[in-house]
């Protein structure tokens, strides 16, 4: 069962990939580590694949209506699909503030592409995954619309349980793969790949067969699988997910849609890819937090959470929820903390007008609790904190940290454990 906050804010949390996803494959679990701090638009992912020999539909990118019209003419396709380029899902059912309904349109007339693009580019598209005001569309993708005779699912990912890459596939594609894993686990297939030997032809062929490809299509699918794996390694991806990985009536195996997740630690050798990172759709506070190596996600509540570690942050949000409160954010401090980071974190939290209380929950393993305490007292004084502050510290130098807080003369409420902290934070808001 999903945790309360995970159910409430799952789509937001997926943007930062702060939790692993799991697929039951037979009796074993396959871990999908979706760490998406780097955000790429659909056309960027498809270009990466195309440049590396993976077959995708022909497409052009346009940032004006005239460019979209010319692109549609150049495609010379039987049917054209026009797709607004934003990072949020649900584009097909979205609504523009221009009045246009839908961020994905099919047409056979290039002139219609130009007319539709004029109502997309420069306007906000609102979907279930965007803020109410929507997200501004700066580019559209003009692509050849291909018929799909059969859809399958394919992913290559880093699986911590086997310390290496795993190929995961299902003959049922185009749907939520977690639902397939839950209802028909026998339709989930996997191949564990030796990172040193690479993917074997026998593995690619076997996966192609398990996905239901036969005859010449089987060899074609195996070739695409191998190329996807080579791309996965080349770009330091943590996951390449293709859904659907399909075939056309003309007998071609095509990657129709893909999500690529990257390892942030590889930025130093993947500069070209990380230069494509699109932060324009982030909340300004998220971009500001990133400057100080803080991971921030805004939520709808009024109790700010200041925590180290994604798992602890999730637990903190959940326990606030279970005690009748609502978290205002998800702020992960991480390790290697400096006082300046603590100060900046408080500056971000207090800038949110929704925040009526702050809960600090730190478990000091790598993190030195004394540094946290010094940062807290400095922030409280310099920012003239006006909302209740509840602090729970545990771990490295916690006694010294408690002395710093107790001797500060500041109105800081200490908590003995997470349950106590959550109750006190919720109670402080209820008093208002």
Swiss-Prot record:
Function text: GTP-specific succinyl-CoA synthetase functions in the citric acid cycle (TCA), coupling the hydrolysis of succinyl-CoA to the synthesis of GTP and thus represents the only step of substrate-level phosphorylation in the TCA. The beta subunit provides nucleotide specificity of the enzyme and binds the substrate succinate, while the binding sites for coenzyme A and phosphate are found in the alpha subunit.
Tissue-by-tissue expression: Mainly expressed in liver, kidney, heart, spleen and skeletal muscle. Also found in intestine and colon, and in low amounts in lung, brain, prostate, testis and ovary.
Cofactor: how bound: Binds 1 Mg(2+) ion per subunit.
Binding residue positions for Mg(2+): 243, 257
Residues annotated as binding substrate: 308, 365-367
Modified residues (N6-acetyllysine): 73, 132, 139, 200, 218, 227, 271, 291, 347, 386, 423
UniProt keywords, alphabetically: Acetylation, GTP-binding, Ligase, Magnesium, Metal-binding, Mitochondrion, Nucleotide-binding, Phosphoprotein, Transit peptide, Tricarboxylic acid cycle
Annotated site location: Important for substrate specificity: 79, 147
The family this protein is said to belong to: Belongs to the succinate/malate CoA ligase beta subunit family. GTP-specific subunit beta subfamily.
Quaternary structure note: Heterodimer of an alpha and a beta subunit. The beta subunit determines specificity for GTP.
GO MF term set: ATP binding; GDP binding; GTP binding; magnesium ion binding; protein-containing complex binding; succinate-CoA ligase (GDP-forming) activity
Binding positions (GTP): 57, 90-92, 146
Cofactor(s) annotated in UniProt: Mg(2+)
Protein name: Succinate--CoA ligase [GDP-forming] subunit beta, mitochondrial
Catalysed reaction equations from the record: GTP + succinate + CoA = succinyl-CoA + GDP + phosphate
InterPro entries tied to this protein: ATP-grasp_succ-CoA_synth-type (IPR013650), ATP_grasp_subdomain_1 (IPR013815), Succ-CoA_synthase_bsu_CS (IPR017866), SUCC_ACL_C (IPR005811), Succ_CoA_betaG_euk (IPR034722), Succ_CoA_ligase-like_bsu (IPR005809), Succinyl-CoA_synth-like (IPR016102)
Predominant subcellular localization, coarse grouping: mitochondrion
Pfam family for this entry, one: Ligase_CoA
Subcellular location: Mitochondrion
Transit peptide per record: 1-37
Pathway(s) where this gene product acts: Carbohydrate metabolism; tricarboxylic acid cycle; succinate from succinyl-CoA (ligase route): step 1/1
């Amino acid at each position: 069962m999903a945790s309360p906050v995970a159910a409430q804010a799952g789509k937001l949390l997926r943007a930062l990939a702060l939790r692993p996803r799991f697929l039951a494959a037979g009796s074993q679990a396959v871990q999908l580590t979706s760490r998406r701090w780097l955000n790429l638009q659909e056309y960027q992912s498809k270009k990466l694949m195309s440049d590396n020999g993976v077959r995708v539909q022909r497409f052009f990118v346009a940032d004006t209506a005239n460019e979209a019209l010319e692109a549609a003419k150049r495609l010379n396709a039987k049917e054209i699909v026009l797709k607004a380029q934003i990072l949020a899902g649900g584009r097909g059912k979205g609504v523009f503030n221009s009045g246009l309904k839908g961020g994905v349109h099919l047409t056979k007339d290039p002139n219609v592409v130009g007319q539709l693009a004029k109502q997309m580019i420069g306007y906000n598209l609102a979907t279930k995954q965007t803020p109410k005001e929507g997200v501004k569309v700066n580019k559209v993708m003009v692509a050849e619309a291909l018929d799909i005779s059969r859809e399958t699912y394919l992913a290559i990912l880093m699986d911590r349980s086997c310390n290496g890459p795993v190929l995961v596939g299902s003959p049922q594609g185009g749907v939520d793969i977690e639902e397939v894993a839950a209802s028909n686990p026998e339709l989930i297939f996997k191949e564990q790949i030796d990172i040193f030997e690479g993917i074997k032809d026998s593995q690619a062929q076997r996966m192609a067969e398990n996905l239901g490809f036969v005859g010449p299509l089987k060899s074609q699918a195996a070739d695409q699988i191998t190329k996807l794996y080579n791309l996965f390694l080349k770009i330091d991806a943590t996951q390449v997910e293709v859904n659907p990985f399909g075939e056309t009536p003309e007998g071609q195996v095509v990657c129709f849609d893909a999500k690529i997740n990257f390892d942030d630690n590889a930025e130093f050798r993947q500069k070209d890819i990380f230069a494509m990172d699109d932060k324009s759709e982030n909340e300004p506070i998220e971009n500001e937090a990133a400057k100080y190596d803080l991971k921030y996600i805004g939520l709808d509540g009024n109790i700010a959470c200041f925590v180290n570690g994604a798992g602890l942050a999730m637990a903190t949000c959940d326990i606030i929820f279970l005690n009748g409160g609502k978290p205002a954010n998800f702020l992960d401090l991480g390790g290697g903390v400096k006082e300046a980071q603590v100060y900046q974190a408080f500056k971000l939290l207090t800038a949110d007008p929704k925040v009526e209380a702050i809960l600090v929950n730190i478990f000091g393993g790598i993190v030195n609790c004394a540094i946290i305490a010094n940062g807290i007292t400095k922030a409280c004084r310099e920012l003239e904190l006006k909302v209740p502050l509840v602090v729970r510290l545990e771990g490295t130098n916690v006694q010294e940290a408690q002395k710093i807080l107790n001797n500060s003369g500041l109105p800081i409420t200490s908590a003995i454990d997470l349950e106590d902290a959550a109750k006190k934070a919720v109670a402080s808001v209820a008093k208002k």
